Design a protein with these regions (language model features):
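Class I SAM-dependent transferase core
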Residues: 2-60, 64, 94, 100-111
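Conserved residues at beta->alpha junctions
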Residues: 9, 90, 162-165
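Residue-level signal for inorganic ion chemistry
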Residues: 22, 77, 163
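Short loop or secondary-structure boundary microenvironments that flank
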Residues: 38, 135-139, 164
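Helical mechanochemical/support elements of P-loop NTPase systems and associated helical scaffolds
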Residues: 41, 91, 95, 166-170
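Conserved SAM/SAH cofactor-binding pocket of Class I
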Residues: 49-138, 146-147
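Short "lid" loop at the C-terminus of a central beta-strand within the Rossmann-like core
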Residues: 119, 141, 164-168
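C-terminal substrate-binding/active-site "lid" region of AdoMet-derived donor-dependent transferases
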Residues: 134, 148-183
Length: 183
């Protein structure tokens, strides 16, 4: 069980496959600096799933994961919430090739991959104010991140910025940008 969500055997198996594929692909492509299985589980999988602390049910909602890299946090959330409508965005093609491979390998449905820069996505009418949730981790500072994510969420939508120890300082520095953008 994780944060009140049951982790059934089939879901755990998907995480095992994801971990194995990530380790294998990382030998050929620089997908992540984290290579140790224990660190992959804590720093990638569990950190990704910590988004569930902000929203207890992602099922049926649309989520855009900006700067997804090797699929974090979007794919772990999709594994736990199979009815999540997932869009993964990154500007690095090889990372998206890996994400598509994982989506296919895990037989995940209702997933979309977009090769684009976040700055351009928010200006595109096909993506502006289209998502229930916009999420990013380790992409940029909170002020700039607000400018990238907030244009993507619908009115009353949710922006999740996974930040580390400097979160409080970044939030204070980003208050003006968040207010201007309607967050």
């Amino acid at each position: 069980q994780f944060i009140g969500f049951p982790l059934f055997e089939d879901r755990l198996r998907l995480f095992e496959i994801y971990e194995s594929e990530l380790i294998e692909w990382n030998t050929r492509f620089n997908l992540t600096a984290i290579k140790n299985p224990d660190e992959i589980r804590t720093k990638h999988f569990l950190d990704s799933l910590s988004c569930a602390l902000a929203i207890n049910d992602f099922n049926g909602r649309s989520l855009v994961d900006v700067g997804t890299g090797a699929g974090f946090p979007g794919i772990p959330l999709k594994i736990i919430f199979p009815d999540l409508k997932l869009t993964l965005v990154d500007s690095v093609g090889k990372k998206l090739v890996f994400c598509q491979h994982i989506i296919d390998r895990l037989s995940l449905t209702d997933c979309r991959i977009i090769h684009a820069r976040a700055e351009d996505l928010g200006k595109d009418p096909l993506h502006r104010e289209r998502y229930d949730i916009a999420v990013a981790r380790a992409v940029t500072g909170l002020s700039a991140l607000s400018e990238l994510l907030l244009p993507l969420v619908k009115r009353k939508g949710i922006m999740i910025a996974q930040k580390g120890e400097t979160a409080a300082e970044e939030l204070k520095a980003a208050e003006k940008a968040i207010r201007i953008l309607g967050g």
